[in-house]
């Protein structure tokens, strides 16, 4: 579901916006849960069969983040950080370079190993490096407060930035969700967001798409 897709613009986004404001009034953390669900739906729209990958990444990195924050011994924290970064890079490399490695093995050793032909999961580079940045901040003591799974999930799968980024700091992003005024309907912010969307659509549909022809 691309941002200039009519399904996104006229169905998904308006429904999410309305339900977000409703959820914000319902309970303290309902807006977080709702945006996480919306993010998973947005991701699964691309390929529902590969969507468990981002769920696995979220759960594993959430666990590593807690291990790093709860471990008082610096050397142990460093080892946990190194292991977590290695696993994240390996996770990314398997999907990105597995067939490249197999092709070179076939060429160098004159064998005929079958290619894996793995599909490249949507936004895997983005959410991998986003979670690595989170783990590094946990190690450096920048993220000290206890993180709820819903918060970390939202940090990773927030749909407006999931496809194109940018990679942001956890504390900076979550501070915006924690701000009560951001959970209220604000006419000025609404029109500002609408203008930004229209500018983005103009750049994409009118300029970028036509320049590539």
Model-derived segments and spans:
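Membrane-embedded transmembrane alpha-helical bundles that form the catalytic cores
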Residues: 1-213
